[in-house]
Amino acid sequence: MKKKQTTKALLVTCITDHKQDFYRLAFSYVKNQDDALDIVQESIKKALSSVETVRNPETIKSWFYKILVRTAIDFLRKQKKIRVMDDETIEFLSKGKEDHYKDTDLHEALDELPYRYKTIIILRFFEDLKLEEIAEITGENTNTVKTRLYRALKLMRIQLTKEDLS
């Protein structure tokens, strides 16, 4: 009973400390504030109901990321949404005086990636996680994560080159 309470307290602390990161990750999938909040809320509910299954409390953040990513992908499968970049989304995702066109092209290229590649790109470059952490979250071998990362970057490069030529 004591371990469950400790793990639950760690989970609550983790969610509180990283709520912006979790929201940003959910938003990167659905491009809608309300849906992103729903995904985070659903992930928290799932995590709290299964917190006793955590074997190593030190990996609670990675464990929650895994729940969040799977919840976001499930949401997209259920909704089968066509994501449109509106002005609010572009403004939310852009930072400062960056070139909005390049930023938009980058996000469109990212959106066109299959989920298994998109997840790795988001976790690596937007959430700044190490390859080992990504492997733990996705349940894949570290070498598989590396391979998918390089393939994803190659696919994005091809997509961005196509857009530059057109």
Curated annotation (Swiss-Prot):
GO molecular function, one term: sigma factor activity
Annotated region of DNA binding: 131-150
One Pfam family here: Sigma70_r2
The keyword Transcription is annotated on this UniProt entry: yes
GO biological process: DNA-templated transcription initiation; regulation of DNA-templated transcription; response to stress
Keywords, in A-Z order: Activator, DNA-binding, Sigma factor, Transcription, Transcription regulation
Motif Polymerase core binding boundaries: 38-51
Similarity remark: Belongs to the sigma-70 factor family. ECF subfamily.
Function: Sigma factors are initiation factors that promote the attachment of RNA polymerase to specific initiation sites and are then released. Positively regulates the expression of proteins involved in stress responses against bacitracin, paraquat and tellurite.
Assembly mode: Interacts with RsiV.
NCBIfam families on file: sigma70-ECF
Protein name: RNA polymerase sigma factor SigV
Annotated organism of origin: Bacillus subtilis (strain 168)
